[in-house]
A protein has these predicted regions:
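Active-site-proximal, substrate-binding regions of enzyme catalytic domains
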Residues: 2-132, 138-149
Length: 149
């Protein structure tokens, strides 16, 4: 297998909040030999949802605790380049968004738009990798497909 084939087999998942509040083990499963990118808006949404008394609130709290524990064990360099997890990497996006490639009507304050743009940037910056947006939000999937993400 060539190096480019190996890179293509490795996937980069950009995750949305909806997947994390519906599947508590999503991060552990997705990082197995892959890279998971956690956009800053997802951290903000988890923070808002963690106080809910519903099952989604419980899952958000569980996910936030897992992320906190994972970050606590990571070095400063790993926080910058990706935290090793299950043979893959967990990367935290800083929240700074390059608006190059933003479309007419793009709203940087709308989490879905910011996450889709981030996935689009990862696709362009890492053409050798398969970049996949993971969400349970049908409207977000439709918007992402319209942007060829």
């Amino acid at each position: 297998m060539s190096q480019s084939d190996a890179a293509r087999d490795r996937k980069t998942y950009v995750v949305d909040t909806s997947i994390l509040v519906s599947a508590p083990d999503a991060l552990q499963n997705l990082t197995t030999n892959n890279t998971v990118v956690l956009p800053f808006p997802v951290l903000q949404e988890l923070d808002r949802r963690r106080t809910a008394t519903s099952g989604a609130g419980y899952t958000a709290r569980t996910t936030v605790r897992f992320l906190d524990d994972t970050q606590t064990r990571a070095s400063v360099e790993e926080m910058r380049t990706g935290i090793p997890l299950n043979g893959g990497l967990l990367k935290f996006h800083s929240g700074t968004l390059d608006l190059t490639g933003a479309w007419p009507g793009f709203n940087a304050t709308y989490a879905d738009d910011a996450i889709i743009l981030l996935a689009d940037h990862y696709q362009r910056e890492h053409p050798e990798e398969q970049v996949i947006l993971v969400t349970r939000d049908a409207a977000m999937r439709c918007k992402a497909r319209a942007r060829a993400v």
